[in-house]
Regions:
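Short, charged recognition helix plus adjacent turn
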Residues: 9-12, 34, 60-77
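Helix-turn-helix DNA-binding elements, focusing on the entry/boundary residues of the two helices
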Residues: 7, 18, 29, 43-46
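DNA major-groove recognition helix of helix-turn-helix/homeodomain DNA-binding modules
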Residues: 44-59
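Short alpha-helical DNA-recognition segment
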Residues: 15-33
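Amphipathic, hydrophobic secondary-structure cores in small proteins
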Residues: 33-44, 48
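A short, Lys/Arg-rich alpha-helix, primarily the initiator
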Residues: 1-14, 20
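Alpha-helical residues within the helix-turn-helix
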Residues: 12, 23, 51
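The DNA-recognition helices of helix-turn-helix-type DNA-binding domains
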Residues: 28, 39-40, 67
Length: 77
């Protein structure tokens, strides 16, 4: 699933439009839709989206040893 598809699915689950999400993160709907179409949403923007919706965003690398290297908008230790 692409990042854009994940964001659209998230909007459906949160019962908001993509345009409303754009406004909540301080972007115009037109600009945000272009980013979705081009798949150019940044990690910083993903974290901003999670913060705006009061949810957790996490990105994880899982090593062969089972150790995890994480980043996200909440405690990513």
């Amino acid at each position: 699933m692409s990042t854009s598809d994940m964001i659209k699915q998230l909007c459906e689950h949160m019962n908001i439009s993509v345009a409303e999400l754009a406004r909540r993160i301080g972007q115009t709907p037109q600009n945000f839709n272009k980013k979705l179409q081009r798949e150019t949403v940044t990690l910083k923007e993903l974290i901003t989206i999670a913060d705006a919706l009061d949810i957790t965003y996490e990105q994880v690398f899982i090593l062969h040893s089972g150790a995890k290297i994480k980043t996200g908008n909440k405690d990513a230790s």
